[in-house]
């Protein structure tokens, strides 16, 4: 099922790149200090 794919998605480099981009956007907008 879908939940079996979640670990693969989380461990994928693309997901980590997206997380980094989101984190950068949040920190640059002052969302997180």
Swiss-Prot record:
Top-level taxon of origin: Eukaryota
Taxonomic placement: Eukaryota, Metazoa, Chordata, Craniata, Vertebrata
State the name under which the record lists this protein.
Pardaxin P-2
As for what it does, the entry says:
Exhibits unusual shark repellent and surfactant properties. Forms voltage-dependent, ion-permeable channels in membranes. At high concentration causes cell membrane lysis.
Its quaternary organisation is: In aqueous solution exists as a tetramer.
Q: Which Pfam families match?
A: Pardaxin
Q: Mind listing the UniProt keywords for this protein, alphabetically?
A: Ion transport, Membrane, Secreted, Target cell membrane, Target membrane, Toxin, Transmembrane, Transport
Organism, as annotated? Pardachirus pavoninus (Peacock sole)
- Which family does the similarity line name? Belongs to the pardaxin family.
